[in-house]
Amino acid sequence: MTILIDRHSDQNDAGDEIVEKNQGNGKEEETELVLDAGFEAPHTNSFGRTFRDYDAESERRRGVEEFYRVNHIGQTVDFVRKMREEYEKLNRTEMSIWECCELLNEFIDESDPDLDEPQIEHLLQTAEAIRKDYPDEDWLHLTGLIHDLGKVLLHSSFGELPQWAVVGDTFPVGCAFDESIVHHKYFKENPDYDNPSYNSKYGIYTEGCGLDNVLMSWGHDDYMYLVAKENQTTLPSAGLFIIRYHSFYALHKSEAYKHLMNNEDRENMKWLKVFNKYDLYSKSKVRVNVEEVKPYYLSLTNKYFPSKLKW
């Protein structure tokens, strides 16, 4: 994986090789960071198939496609605004980060074609893989642990939202649905698809408006972003960016919607691309010893969050 960076040196803090690239088109010479850390992405998922292959025949394929059909029909501007208005109140409960992690033991993500393990397994796999390769970036370890905590929206005490309103790839609403979005064909049944206010390239937005001003399809990403922000986390902006956009594959895989990004977004994208490698490819059947790593992650939650958060 290669990401653009601004600084010019021979190595980054993790020892990754930095290679100079001349664009050859009259633009400034840019530097690329070649991620050369210890974690190696496997070729197949826990089912022995290619990662994020939504067409491969598998026991989960039909269920995943049906999930996206319902998701793409239901995620409208009106729905997103309604959900944000409801959940930004943060009046459901108060609990710690770790208590929230434990709640996720009950759930399996129906939109994920790569894994059928409880969510806390994925959180710890992601965090531990990052920790191994980036030992000095403790904020990134914690981001790995908490990035999916918004999936508590599936829990009865949080409204028990249907999976299509909690998980899956995210995308902007209020502008055209890019064709790179998985199972794009189902957007034709979305009420916003033929709405002239929402179906152009920019829709209700302007060029370079910044992703923070863009309504994203509602789900665990946006909810956890709201929780972290409103509870005054001291995570760097890149951490919040990862939390809100880690499921925005149309952007960080297909480079769609870049016309909405501002300079801060472009800076934070560098870390999102680093994170995505671990989020996607660390999924496996190998268990993490929860009790062994728990004290370390409790120390991080105490560093970057209050002991109890409003949810």
Curated annotation (Swiss-Prot):
Residues annotated to bind Fe cation 2: D148, H220, H246
Pathway in which this enzyme or protein is active: Polyol metabolism; myo-inositol degradation into D-glucuronate; D-glucuronate from myo-inositol: step 1/1
Which reaction equation describes what this protein catalyses?
myo-inositol + O2 = D-glucuronate + H2O + H(+)
The record's annotation in InterPro entries points to: Inositol_oxygenase
Q: Which residues bind substrate?
A: R52, D109, E110, S111, K151, G168, D169, H246, S247
List where Basic and acidic residues composition bias occurs.
Answer: 1-11
Q: Which cofactors are named for this entry?
A: Fe cation
Q: In which tissues is it expressed?
A: Expressed in roots, young leaves, stems, flowers and siliques.
Q: Please summarize what the entry says happens upon disruption of the gene.
A: Incorporation of the inositol pathway-derived monosaccharides is strongly reduced in knockout AtMIOX1 seedling walls.
Q: Which UniProt keywords apply?
A: Ascorbate biosynthesis, Cytoplasm, Iron, Metal-binding, Oxidoreductase
Q: Where found, per UniProt? A: Cytoplasm
Annotated Pfam families: MIOX
Annotated GO MF terms: inositol oxygenase activity; iron ion binding
Q: Could you confirm whether the keyword Oxidoreductase appears in this record?
A: yes
Chain positions covered by the region annotation Disordered? 1-29
- What family, per the record? Belongs to the myo-inositol oxygenase family.
Protein task: Catalyzes the oxygenative cleavage of myo-inositol to D-glucuronate. Involved in the biosynthesis of UDP-glucuronic acid (UDP-GlcA), providing nucleotide sugars for cell-wall polymers. May be also involved in plant ascorbate biosynthesis.
Q: What is this protein called?
A: Inositol oxygenase 1
Per the UniProt entry, what species is this protein from, by scientific name? Arabidopsis thaliana
